[in-house]
């Protein structure tokens, strides 16, 4: 009898595994069929993450034949909404739309309730955008070379960002450290207060996304000096890159991506990836993304994973080397 049990045990294990795999496969083939699909925008309404999520909402609903809704769950630089998605059932009905803070939060917030790499699966990289270093139009800084000269002088140069640990803050720390420049960081509580002071000349320099800065450039109240990406921005084609300005290889883009809970069936991630890529190939959607200063990227889940991992590694070193802490 014991011999028979020992013989049956491996067979039972194989059978259980086959049932599990078959169940997951059937679930993936039937997706989407049972409920609303949620896109969790991990920042409050009105910002770029919210707007990106809402650009995806209606086209995805039409393509999938299933209701897709945006749910805003902001706070802690996107960590609260991301934690909710990481803890959601991996059934293809909950996704996160995240910002570049997702690549920084693991280094700034050691007590996160989720593992950014293990508990979430990248679906697609939506797009990237340059950060823009700008100054008041009446400022003494006419070019980025003027900023470099001031930052290398005893007095240094002050700049404002949307907050400590933001991509703008980390990019300026990386820039200063790589070239022996001294910058004084002035953190603000968001883009609105930052740009109000920058336009008024209360802070000499401001760094923010194209989405944040360009309206003030268009109104002639701000002068753009340089962008932080390796290529010029189509939205600010006359503004040089840091690479062109003597800092070869410097590339610090803002970015947006869609993630799923880990263990979401690969077939569902593949399908969602294909559907989002299809949305972004729509000329009208691409035009609306461009209006926000976002350069559409798209691509495979694996390409998104490689990009996000690289961002996490880059900024983890900057945070550690400069002892940067979140607000």
Question: Residues of each region from the PLM?
Answer:
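Hinge/capping helix and adjacent helix->loop/strand transition within the periplasmic-binding protein
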Residues: 36-37, 87-93, 107-193, 242, ...
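Bacterial N-terminal signal peptides
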Residues: 10-21
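C-terminal lobe and pocket-closing loops
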Residues: 128, 213-282, 310-313
